[in-house]
Structure formats: C-alpha cells, structure tokens
Amino acid sequence: MMLDPINHHFQAHEEAYYSRFFNEQRGLHMIKVLPGGVYVSDQEELICTGLGSCVSACIWDPVKRVGGMNHFLLPFHNHFEEKHWHADELLSGASRYGSYAMEMLLNQLLSLGARRERLRMKLFGGAQMMGFHSMIGEKNVEFVLHYAEQEGLEVVAYDLGGLEPRKIMFDPLTGKAWLKRIPFAEINHLRREEERYAHTLEKQTDNDSEVELF
C-alpha cells in the first residue's frame, strides 16, 4: 500500500514497520519490511526483508498485478506455552496474533482490487536460530502452513525451517521472489532485531483483546 509521505501518522508507521530506499543498480525503489510490518503495492518496486525465526508470506494477484509481504512472529509468554502450542488452537493468543498478521496483508490486497480466489502465496523463514527460542521457528512454520490450508490459499513455493536465516526480495506485480542465505557474520544483528520484536510482543499480547480476529 502506498502511503502519503505528507501524513505524519503514516510517516511514523513507515519508520516503525518498513523503510524505503532507492536501489541504483536495479533502478527501483525497495521497501524493507521490518518485524511486525506489512507492505502492499501495485507499483514497480521491490519488497525485501531479512528473516531468522520470523516468517513472511508473499502474496499476489497475478491478474490485478498487486502484491505484498508481511513479517511476523508468534508471541509466546513462556517456553511451556511455546512447546505445547499447536496450530489448531485457533483461540490461543499466538494463533489470534498470527491470523491478525495474515488478515492485515490479505485485507490490504483486497482493498487494492485483488480477488481472493486469484491469490497466490510464497512462504519463507522459520529458521531454528541457536540461542533464540529453540522451537519458535518451527511453530511459526506450523502456523503459516496450517493457516494457508484452512483458508484455501494456494502455496506455489516455500522455503521454510532449517538453520540458516534468509534475505528475501519480492516483486509484488509478478510474484517473482529471490532468496539468499544470510552469512554467519550478519546473524547476530538479525537475532537482536527479532529479539526486540519478540520482547515488544510479550508486552502487547498481555491483553488479548487488543488483537481482533477477522
């Protein structure tokens, strides 16, 4: 979704959840989606993100030529809750937050004229990063695959799980995606970014009423 740069509320949203820069080599604007963010576009630009334990859904309508990406992590209050959670627990706080992250992306696509029956999806992320919530990547993968199946969304490609973080680049008009494994030297920065996001979620999800299930 293209946001009005004059509107200060949207400026604050951009600073918090995504950043925009011009890639001279490709001659295109690129939008980096940060943890907790959603970005949708019908413009000639590329959407990118870095993923450790988080997951991203890249969804597009090939007829309308509109697409978008989210970047999220399921919130768990403790290791016991994380270990025993399953994707069919639809009313749990983690499932409701995950559904909210997916519906935010879907609703913004539909608002730009996409048709739900035409939507295609590619899924990335969910790595098991050492020293960071040992099962969180696995649970994120379980959730997003279960959600796609339950909602009847066509998953045409995915690269999920494993041990290596990823960099993703996505063309919202064509659905083409590029994946690159993140070198070990960059892992600590990504881990810190996701840990800050997870800590923020722990505070926000103490009151589940703040998350609406569509």
Swiss-Prot record:
GO MF term set: protein-glutamine glutaminase activity
E.C. number: 3.5.1.44
InterPro entries referenced in this protein's UniProt entry, alphabetically: CheD-like_sf, Chemorcpt_Glu_NH3ase_CheD, Cytotoxic_necrot_fac-like_cat
Annotated disulfide bonds: none
Alphabetized Gene3D superfamilies for the sequence: 3.30.1330.200
Coiled coil: none
Gene Ontology process terms (BP): chemotaxis
UniProt keyword annotations, A-Z: Chemotaxis, Hydrolase
Family statement drawn from the similarity comment of this UniProt entry: Belongs to the CheD family.
HAMAP family listed in its UniProt record: CheD
Known role: Probably deamidates glutamine residues to glutamate on methyl-accepting chemotaxis receptors (MCPs), playing an important role in chemotaxis.
Protein name as catalogued: Probable chemoreceptor glutamine deamidase CheD
Species name: Vibrio vulnificus (strain CMCP6)
